[in-house]
């Protein structure tokens, strides 16, 4: 497991690696002002997003190569938090968009550029991993999501060797999303695994547990729609 989209240490040490909005501000998962006071209400979680078009990409490549070299058996690598719909206007992205003639006022064009950056990054990782562990499975989480569907529309999931469908129905998309999502990938010939958890609102939310009946229903739905179960 490797968290691509969330690394507080790297974001603090290298602000030039962070995703930026049109005004140059760092893009975060939730609002938490830099000058917030100790007793101000805090979001459930918050982090700064990092851009694959910066030195962060090289940093990841170095770390993944170290993993591949140090461990003689690597059966797979699972990379988390790929969100192309969070458009980036950092210096590197702005410069490349200008070079490619991308209209920065065209949301669809900027989105396609973001997918292009992610695609290049993912293909480089796939090539690197295959040099050391050609049989290893590789998955980039976020590419199979049908909500906020920029990754999905541009078929970013083609860089995966298998498809995991992240599904917390009580917070993301409800219970009607899985049938459509699973059938799409099964009909395309992919093996699929559906991921859910005891959490109601987010991964790592400690506010409560789902009722056992709800978990059994989710497991039955996964099996009914042809997926492996992962809780």
What are these regions (language model features)?
Residues 5-71, 104-111, 115, 123:
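Active-site-adjacent "subsite" loops/lids of carbohydrate-active enzymes
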Residues 17-42, 85-100, 145-179:
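Repeat-unit-sized solenoid/scaffold elements
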Residues 22-25, 98-101, 186-187, 214-218:
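Short, surface-exposed linear patches
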Residues 1-5, 80-81, 142, 196:
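Glycine-rich, histidine-containing beta strand-loop boundary motifs that form or position
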Residues 10-12, 107-108, 119-231:
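Hydrophobic targeting/anchoring helices
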Residues 52-159:
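Active-site neighborhood of glycoside hydrolase catalytic domains
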Residues 7-9, 83-85, 201:
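Short secondary-structure capping/turn micro-motifs that flank functional sites
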């Amino acid at each position: 497991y490797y968290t691509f989209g969330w690394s507080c240490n790297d974001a603090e040490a290298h602000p030039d690696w962070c995703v930026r909005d049109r005004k140059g501000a760092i893009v975060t998962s939730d609002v938490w002002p830099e000058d917030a006071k100790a007793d101000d209400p805090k979001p459930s979680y918050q982090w700064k997003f990092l851009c694959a078009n910066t030195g962060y990409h090289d940093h990841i490549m170095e770390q993944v190569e170290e993993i591949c070299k140090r461990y003689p058996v690597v059966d797979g690598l699972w990379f988390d938090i790929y969100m192309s719909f969070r458009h980036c206007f950092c210096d590197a992205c702005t410069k490349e968009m200008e070079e490619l003639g991308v209209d920065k006022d065209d949301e669809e064009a900027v989105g396609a550029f973001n997918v292009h950056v992610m695609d290049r990054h993912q293909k480089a990782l796939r090539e690197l991993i295959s040099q050391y562990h050609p049989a290893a499975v590789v998955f980039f989480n976020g590419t199979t999501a049908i909500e906020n569907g920029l990754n999905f529309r541009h078929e970013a999931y083609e860089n995966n060797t298998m498809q995991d469908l992240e599904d917390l129905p009580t917070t993301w998309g409800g219970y009607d999303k899985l049938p459509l999502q699973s059938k799409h990938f099964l009909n395309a010939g992919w093996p699929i695994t559906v991921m859910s958890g005891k959490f109601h609102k987010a991964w790592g939310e400690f506010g409560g547990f789902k009722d056992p009946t709800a978990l059994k229903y989710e497991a039955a739905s996964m099996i009914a729609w042809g997926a492996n179960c992962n809780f």
